[in-house]
Amino acid sequence: DDLFLQAGKAYARMRPLTVHRNPEHWYDLGEATQRPLAELDVVLMRKDPPVDAEFINAVHLLGFAEREGVLVVNPTAALLQCNEKLFAQQFPQCCAPTVVASRDDVLRAFHAEHGDVIFKPLDGMGGTGIFHIGPDGRNIGAVIEQLTLRGQRQIMAQRYLPEIKDGDTRILLVDGEPVPFGLARIPSAGETRGNLAAGGRGVSRELTERDHWLIQQVQPMIREKGLIFVGLDVIGDYITEINVTSPTCVREIDDQRGTDISGMLLDAIERRLA
């Protein structure tokens, strides 16, 4: 609600921000001022999904500032084009068997073929709305009905990857280059979701040869779209999502590995501004 458009120019209510390394009191905000976004050098778009109408409207407003020369990270065109779950499907060689549909018969046929399937919405985050349906198909009708809103909304069905027990690994790319360590988000007991927001624990690990191959597959398009900060989600040998809205796990990797991912990102931004 701080963004608005007037006479063809994007404005925002802004406050200076000071960040502290104290989980009990980790930031301070200064006095609010109302200014045109064109006065800024950079805007970091870090609004979390869902990518709903309000998210899309905010991106469109940032596009007005972008056209006045402000660097928006990530670029507005890429944010509008790259649904985080569908974007990965542009690299089928990197993905587990997947179907996207709203039709009950298509989703049931996929489950019948693969037996063990994850169903999830296309616009969620943090493991919300994710269901695991086993070979017995128990509750499949209720899950499909709930997620598709009785056939009115497209959802994703993906073959279940048992490697999730070893973690859903977040791999961060800064200006197309990978951070050398990922964060394996390991599900808690009885869970199939590794997301930290769903109770998973994060363990940093070095990237594997397969990870580097996956990165090489997506790098050209990521660079072509001007994406500066990207998070790949990898389970076993497969990419499950390509996060472009608000990639996380920076602090967890930095704390375990002594890296400075924020510094890498700011260096990349400064290179774009030079």
Where are these regions (language model features)?
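ATP-binding N-terminal substructure of ATP-dependent carboxylate-amine bond-forming enzymes
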Residues: D1-L71, A78
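Flexible, glycine/proline-enriched loop segments at strand-loop-helix junctions
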Residues: R46-A53, P92-A101, I130-F131
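Short amphipathic alpha-helical segments and helix-helix/interface helices
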Residues: V59-E66, K85-A88, L107-R108, I144-E145, ...
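Hydrophobic alpha-helical segments and helix pairs
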Residues: G69-F119
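Short glycine-enriched loops at secondary-structure junctions
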Residues: T76-L80, R185-P187, I235-Y238
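Phosphate-binding site of ATP-dependent enzymes
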Residues: D105, A112-D116, D123-L214, I222
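ATP-dependent carboxylate activation and anion-phosphoryl transfer catalytic cores
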Residues: A189-G190, E206-A274
